[in-house]
């Protein structure tokens, strides 16, 4: 059985530039801040956003970090590990739900092997993150499902991107699913099982896989953990 902890919780920081000054909005909860960002794009000439995912620590037979985050999160992740009595060298594996920069950019200070689906290594996002990741030891996942360790399974959950994966982690409280950006930026469509957009059919299939696991808890990339 594994213990699941969030090392760095998700947050979004939205800012606007007015009269030569940067104004950071106080709202940082991920879904609400995303809605604010989209609204402000129609109201303000210069608006920006940066976002951190949930960075998750799995402790059991192996010590695994899932989605370390943006490059600027290298030091915070190391410090968060230290508060739990861990050094970077204690990490056996980094797992990327997908290879977008906000999930895959903070691997350097951990220096552990990186597991990512092989489809992501052929995606446009690999142009941005691949140079760093290929300096590390890559574990290229292939196919539609597999096991990273006893008690940690993965399944391909396309929709957000083709090589996206989700994890099912066995814990004493029941299965915990880490699904990256397969769900989000909000929960409403997942709760109703009615995805929208050009990848709706793929997302619905991915959501059905997640529900079929019967999770006690779901941790998405940019949402607070929830029980489905």
Residue ranges of predicted features:
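Zn-dependent metallo-beta-lactamase
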Residues: 1-61, 206-209, 214
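Core dinuclear metal-dependent hydrolase active-site scaffold
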Residues: 3-9, 56-59, 144-172
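Active-site metal-binding loops of divalent metal-dependent hydrolases
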Residues: 9-11, 63, 68-71, 99, ...
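Active-site-proximal loop/helix segment associated with metal-binding centers of metalloenzymes
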Residues: 25, 32-52, 118-145, 186-193
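Active-site metal-binding motif and surrounding structural segment of the metallo-beta-lactamase
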Residues: 74-116
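Metallo-beta-lactamase
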Residues: 79, 86, 92, 115-156, 162-228, ...
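Short loop/helix-cap segments at secondary-structure boundaries that form the rim of catalytic
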Residues: 104-111, 123-127, 227
